Amino acid sequence: MEVKWGMKASEKIKGIVFAYDTNGEYDMVKELGVEWMRLNICFPWKDKMFGTLSEEYIAARQEIRDTHAKGFQVMPATPPLGGFTYDEEEGKTCWHEHFPEFVGKKGTEEFYENVRESMRFICEDLGEAAGIYWQCMNEIDIPVFSNDYPDDILADTARACAEGIRRGNPEARCGINISCYNENAVRIADLVYREGHSFYYMGVDQYFGSWQPGDAENWIGVLDALYERYRLPVLANEWGYSSAGELAEEMPDPALVPKGLPEVCYVKKWFHEAKGGHTPEVQADYFRRGHRIFAQHPHCLGSFM
């Protein structure tokens, strides 16, 4: 898919991620100058393809409609193959599939076609409540959302998501978001963005100074590298910096960390910090610098905090 684009700073996406529940805090978000919200949408049916809508889907759809009615543009994020949850009392993680068995065996054309049709349905069902931008799945390069599925299944499911969305709206602008810029992430992204893809942008999440070492200025190199590699506008699907939290003195023993649980979530401390530490003042300065970078970078589509 060839993309020709040019964008003024005032036209770029200024968004925020509400991955779970907005709690109706629309006025507070508007005070930030936010125009876009990223909201999750789940698989629609609980019994069969084009069957009975699940309660979870109905609730997610209503939240997107309510958010749009409040004057926001919504970027829907489609479901990954699944996700891990953590039971702290048991000290164990549990994997939850997001596509029911009736969608088909993963890796088969039946599965991919049902994914396409599911996404087409979602796109048409949301209608004008969904903005032109879509995020296909979430951070498919890390086990939290991919478990041990093969790379080709992850990549082809993401491609099928975009193809289905564009069946519902040929003008839709789709992309994925890798969890960070590293060798493993771009290896999988290369499969997603191979010839014949239906994507408009390349997306990436980075939390320099919190989840990764560095500071806001490290975004410049990531934006440059991803644009050079994929020749598509780059969206910062997630970014930010924590205003609180202690710094861990050492990494935990990998053997003790449950599968699918990030080390940060296990120890409940950060392994990185920007100069000045995790404070509201450092956070505010970090955001000022980050927003300036996204506004000025010629290949950046915008960002979601």
Predicted region positions:
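N-terminal substrate-binding region of glycoside hydrolase catalytic domains
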Residues: 1-112, 203-208
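Structural preference for beta-strand elements that scaffold enzyme active sites
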Residues: 4-6, 11-15, 35-38, 71-75, ...
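Surface-exposed amphipathic alpha-helices with a cationic face
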Residues: 7-8, 30, 62-69, 158-171, ...
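Active-site cleft segment of glycoside hydrolase catalytic domains centered on the general acid/base Glu
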Residues: 23, 47-50, 57-58, 87-199, ...
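Non-catalytic positions within long, well-ordered alpha-helices that form the structural scaffold/packing
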Residues: 29-33, 68, 127, 193-195, ...
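Aromatic- and acid-rich polysaccharide-binding/catalytic face
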Residues: 37, 76, 119, 130-132, ...
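Short, solvent-exposed turn/loop segments enriched in Gly/Ser/Thr/Pro and often Arg
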Residues: 78-82, 180, 304-305
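Substrate-binding cleft of secreted/luminal carbohydrate-active enzymes
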Residues: 236-239, 257-305
